Amino acid sequence: MNAKIDKFLQKLGIERPEGEHDRVTRGESIASNFADPFVEPDPTVGEWFQEKLPNRHEFGQYCLDLLPFLRWVHRYNLQWLIGDLIAGITVGAVVVPQGMAYAELAGLEPQFGLYSSFVGVIVYWFFATSKDITIGPVAVMSTLVGEILQELSPKFPDIPDYKIAGSLAVITGAIVFFMGLIRVGWIVDFIPLPAIAAFMTGSSITIIAGQVPSLLGNKDAGFDTNGATYMTIIKTLKHLPESNINAAMGVTSLFLLYLLRETCTYCAKRWPNKKKIWFFANTLRTVFVILLYTLISWLVNRHRRGVDGQSEPLFDLIGTVPRGFKNMNVPTMNADVIRNYVGHLPGAVIVLLIEHIAISKSFGRVNNYTINPSQELIAIGVTNLIGPFFGAYPATGSFSRTAIKSKAGVRTPFAGVITGVLILLAIYALTAVFFYISKAVLAAVIIHAVGDLILPIGQLYAFWKVSPLDALIFVGGVIIIIFTSIEIGIYVTVCVSAAVLLFRIAKAHGEFLGRIKVQTINGKDQRNIWLPENHQDGSNPLLSVQSPYPGVFVYRFTESFIYANANHYTDEVVDYIKRATRKTHVDVFAKPGDRPWNDPGPRKFNPDAIAEDTRPTLKAIIFDMSSVTHVDVTSTQVLVDVKNQLDRWASPDTVQWHFAGIRDRWIKRALAAIKMHETTSVKAKPLFSVAEVGQFSSENDATVNNEGQGPISTQKEDIETGINVERQQQQDEQEQQEADNAGRNSYSYHRYLPVLGVDRAFHPDVDSAVRAVIDTLEQDRIEQEEHKSSSDLAS
């Protein structure tokens, strides 16, 4: 039956894998009396599925992770409550004016910012893995929503803007929620820091440029502030003479905000024992400025409400804010509306992800806890799915409010509930006060909030010192945002960063290694280290890196060996080896036309020139795979092609192929599948590394001899080279002498186990592989000399 199966598989071109029994038998013959045999089992597809698919326990953990508050809520205590009360009240005082300001930025009425703020803090704590994050309206997302509304409002005049914004929140929330459910939060890691910094800086400059007209009161001068940032700046400067009394409110409030911040910061350093007091004073500066200028506005405009025959206010005010949740409703999901903003969805989703995950990870590291990015995506998704039922628009994590919450001493995510209560009070009790808030003051609040998101020059210089290319990506991203739009800037920076990543993988340069013997400064420890022959790693160029053996090459991969870089790697290997070695057998062509067109050999065969070539012939190649985490079908096929190419170069000799430092069983399986695990030398002596697992005596283990393995000598067996080296340890000799004097008729032996499988040319490190290759080559050389001597005697 087996013969028929083999014949059928042979017709299909499938080579039946080697039986496990055969491999184990060969392993036993290799191990001999030195060590117990060990043959590495290949991983199976079943094992892969078992590793990837969750078991019952993992599924239970997955379900529990969906509601992280269950892990800590039963331990909630009074001390935590006090910290959460302080932080929640502090953030609540800040989020009310910020929420209304960001709603203005989105082109919506102020109450929608309050709705978004309320839903964000109330919902988030159920799903939070960060105690510091505050979800709500943010400047960048509000700007993006404003751009979308400006584009869609003329097309759908019958649909209110807040319903379009709510529809956008539902769609983006559903996308992010699904990403969280399938646990792909790691995808955010593909967006590097320079791209995030460029996005934040460019967006901040765009927002500031768009708010300056409101700050100065010349927004109604007839120019559009939603175009490219550079055009907004130019138009603002042109209409600067048209500024009005709003500028007095806006500029002075902005100046006061920065003055209070600098004063509180200085006082905290000057009087460190009162640092906490100055922190809260600094945190509440926005609230103080809003209240102060609202009082001024009320004093000036209390009889200028623009209703009941009263004159218009002297400067622009928010106006009437409805009390309560007047816009609660089921979100309107219009297919035509969705079709019109679907092109903006990638940018909107990226904004939701970048700001929230970057902030949560940063504060997690600062406060010594770890967030779950995928669970944070679920939190964002649920918030934006529920929010539109209350009239909210897209929301995500806020940097400024998160920083305030962290510094205020928040203890748990429950602080969001405290903040939500304050927002609820504001929605129901303070709407009459909101009427007198100046729009110019709100513009000052926005400018002051987003100004901190601009990357400092010192940080840009740090980028330049670490990686000039990353610094250029940052600068380019900011310029693109200023001259086009936030969305295009996001796409370009992300795509450029991805292209740089792919280029670095595809054009990864390996290293040919040489040996240097080093020792510690006290001279007690000597070992071999392997450094690049060209010293590109920055090692001392005065050191002479030695080749391991004539015709033996050690090549280190610096990235995974995959389809993108396989040809680049192997081209480096082949080109270098052909330059460093000579062909074992020089082809002789009777006619010039017999020579291949791509063979640049001499026109005529010259034996003297061949004799003068002192380059060695190719003997062995050792690949250091310690940096390789993946191989694929393409890369393994390229490796087979290169093997055949170099085998022809060294023909009729055989080339040994060895692999060191393989860290993944699937890589070993792939190499074994293409027959790269064999030493390719029939005469090769089986060599493998072993490790001592302990010393035993015949009294403790009397079954060893019965099993036929026998005692292993107290001499150390160096299996790598087959050379017995005397163990010159005085302690062992003393113990043996004491045992003899005591008249014990027993012996002791050391037991060794192979580190890797004994039937494959895989080695733990480069040193082991080199020793195995050299031993085989020396063995071949001795046999050739003996054969030559025998031939000479016979003649």
What are these regions (language model features)?
Residues N2-T520, K524, G757, E778-Q779, ...:
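Transmembrane helical cores of multi-pass ion-transport proteins
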Residues M1-Y62, F512-S795:
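Cytosolic C-terminal regulatory domains/tails of membrane transporters and channels
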